[in-house]
A protein has these predicted regions:
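Cytosolic regulatory regions of ion transport systems
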Residues: 1-190
Length: 190
């Protein structure tokens, strides 16, 4: 896959290296020459200095034939503009955008060209909740702009659901159990 990453900070550089190691072709764009210079061009990673909010820079990066654009700068407004241009001007099939300020999370939707938003503050809050709670529900991920999600439920000692079959539990109709962790082993329900 060809992936264009807007933002060569620590997040963008890490993503570029990991995705390139998985066999993807990566183009990284950043306005800051020092950020671009920290990324070495290889057979699978190309770096480009420029403003990813500009159509001509996205054109030079090959956004028109990208499978994914990831807008991961440290600026929410830039990430939204990059997402909108990627989707509207270039028809990129999948646009992922980083949310820096949780107050801006509501804007990261299809109207702005965002297919998947990643909110670091939101994810960290979920991880902290998971670390400090027991016998409760922790939201892990949100899909389709909050219409559905993935949650982890930890059963407290003495819960009536312990040792029951999934079929015998009275779960909401819209809920699906995708995995059970029992004694450290993952069990996928049939």
């Amino acid at each position: 896959m060809k992936i264009v990453i807007a933002g060569a900070g620590s997040v963008g550089r890490y993503m570029a290296k990991q995705l390139a190691a998985s066999g993807h072709t990566i183009v990284v764009i950043d306005n800051d020459p020092s950020a671009v210079s920290r990324l070495q061009n290889t057979d699978t990673i190309t770096s480009l200095q420029g403003d990813a909010c500009e159509v001509d820079v996205l054109t030079a990066a090959g956004a028109a034939d990208a499978d994914v654009v990831a807008a991961v700068t440290g600026d929410d407004e830039d990430n939204l503009v990059i997402s909108l241009l990627s989707k509207q001007e270039f028809g990129v099939p999948r646009v992922v955008a980083r949310v820096n300020n949780p107050n801006n999370e509501w804007m990261y939707n299809e109207m702005w060209g965002v297919d998947v938003s990643v909110s670091t503050p939101h994810l960290l809050t979920g991880l902290v909740e998971e670390a400090v709670t027991e016998g409760s529900l922790v939201r892990l991920l949100s899909f389709d702009h909050g219409k559905s999600g993935l949650a982890e439920v930890t059963l407290a000692d003495g819960s009536p659901a312990i040792n029951q079959t999934i079929g015998s539990l009275q779960l909401p109709r819209e809920a699906t159990v995708v995995a059970v962790i029992r004694d450290g082993h993952v069990v996928v329900p049939a």
